[in-house]
Each structure stands twice: as structure tokens, then as C-alpha cells.
Amino acid sequence: MRAWVEQGFALDGVLAAGGGSAGAPVFSAFASGEFVLAHNEEIWRCLAETLENLRTHGAPSREMLWGFGNAVLCTIRRDDGAWLGVFTAPDLGDESAMAVRAKLDAFKQQDFAAPV
């Protein structure tokens, strides 16, 4: 899964990406220069816990957008426990936004039989 995210999200406007799956450690696939702190595993662990807490309490957390001052965080959670977080620039152009959307949709269908 990590290799797929590393390759698939090296897109214009994507600042960082990471994820995890049930029973596997979280990972940071990559982080751009201005978002280098996103390599910190604690960020992804906190995100995993937040998504799980939202799911546990009945919040509609399959697909969410989180707006911040300097970035937007897109999260996808699958039924099998796999999840993905992608930080993008807040002013993503149409072409980049469509490319990110296509990759997020592909993540929902991707078979990650191999370990993270």
C-alpha cells in the first residue's frame, strides 16, 4: 500500500500522503519540503485514532475533507480498515484536483494484499 501511495500521489499540489490499515503500522509515504514535518509518524497515528473514533461514534467518516490555513486534508476510510490521508495545497487547480480525486477513487478499489 505504501508503494502505491508513494507512486500515485506524487502529483502537483499534493503536500504529503500517508495511511495505514487494520493491524498494520501507520506510514508516511512522502512529504514535500514545506510539509516535511508530515514524515512524523505521530501525525499519522493521531489521524488513524481520530478516524477510528469518528467511526466508533457513528460519524460519517468514510470520506472527509478537513480545511486548515495552509492545507486541506482529504481522508478516505475503507471497510477493510485501510485508510489514506492526503494533504493538498488549499488552492488546488482544477487539473490537479481531478487527478487527486481519481487517485482517491482508485484507492477505494485497490487490492492491497501485500503488507503495508
Where are the predicted features?
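Non-catalytic interaction/Regulatory regions outside core domains
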Residues: 1-116
